[in-house]
């Protein structure tokens, strides 16, 4: 089954907040995920830089760390959400603002924009996690309950699904969303990135 780009968010098997992201692509498979101190980025592989002139949607920050929060998305709205949170906007409104403003991608497939934000704390009263999607018919932002993990994809059910996210470290999380568990059922995996909070946010990646 091909579901396009996938993100997962919530708490992992150890009760640690995490985000994970996978590129699945039929048209532009020559991409990689690069990790930095406070972000992970999707970029063309060396020799395929010209691809950005064919499709401006293929390179972006897929993960950003701002304050105590991790932001994950399938496009440039990662930065919009991060900027709004840095300015003091709450998580729900930051996701809704970015999805409403940028809307679905204006490509041949009307690719939906998906996004999520999770706080670093594992204290129930302080924990916050939201996931959202904007397609050509709707915009949804949903709160994810404490202790749960979910995933959502661009061409899947258009609503989040629960998942047992059995990965402990950031690198393990990137590998898990690439081809572990239920994600092994989804085709055309290209690259993946993730962040897991273990006293601090750690960013990982997987490039096959």
From Swiss-Prot:
Protein name per the record: IMP cyclohydrolase
Enzyme Commission no: 3.5.4.10
Family per similarity comment: Belongs to the archaeal IMP cyclohydrolase family.
Catalytic activity: IMP + H2O = 5-formamido-1-(5-phospho-D-ribosyl)imidazole-4-carboxamide
Keywords: Hydrolase, Purine biosynthesis
HAMAP family tied to this protein: IMP_cyclohydrol (MF_00705)
Pathway assigned in UniProt: Purine metabolism; IMP biosynthesis via de novo pathway; IMP from 5-formamido-1-(5-phospho-D-ribosyl)imidazole-4-carboxamide: step 1/1
Alphabetized Pfam families for the sequence: IMP_cyclohyd
InterPro entries found in the cross-reference section: IMP_cyclohydrolase (IPR010191), IMP_cyclohydrolase-like (IPR020600), IMP_cyclohydrolase-like_sf (IPR036795)
Coiled coil regions, renumbered to chain: none
GO MF annotations in UniProt: IMP cyclohydrolase activity
Function description: Catalyzes the cyclization of 5-formylamidoimidazole-4-carboxamide ribonucleotide to IMP.
GO biological process, one term: 'de novo' IMP biosynthetic process
SUPFAM superfamilies cross-referenced by the UniProt entry: Archaeal IMP cyclohydrolase PurO
Domain of life (superkingdom): Archaea
């Amino acid at each position: 089954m091909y579901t396009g780009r996938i993100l997962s968010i919530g708490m992992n098997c150890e009760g640690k907040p995490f985000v994970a992201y996978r590129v699945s692509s039929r048209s532009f498979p020559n991409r990689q995920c690069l990790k930095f101190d406070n972000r992970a980025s999707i970029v063309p592989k060396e020799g395929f830089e010209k691809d950005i002139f064919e499709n401006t949607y293929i390179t972006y920050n897929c993960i950003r760390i701002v304050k105590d929060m991790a932001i994950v998305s399938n496009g440039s709205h990662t930065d919009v959400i991060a900027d709004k949170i840095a300015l003091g906007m709450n998580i729900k409104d930051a996701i809704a603002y970015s999805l409403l403003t940028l809307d679905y991608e204006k490509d041949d497939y009307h690719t939906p924009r998906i996004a999520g934000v999770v706080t670093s704390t594992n204290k129930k009263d302080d924990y916050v996690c939201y996931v959202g999607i904007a397609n050509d018919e709707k915009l949804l932002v949903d709160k994810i309950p404490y202790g749960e993990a979910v995933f959502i994809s661009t061409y899947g059910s258009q609503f989040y699904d629960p998942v047992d996210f059995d990965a402990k470290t950031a690198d393990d999380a990137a590998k898990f969303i690439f081809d572990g568990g239920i994600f092994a059922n989804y085709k055309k995996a290209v690259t993946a990135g993730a962040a897991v909070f273990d006293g601090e946010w750690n960013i990982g990646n997987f490039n096959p």
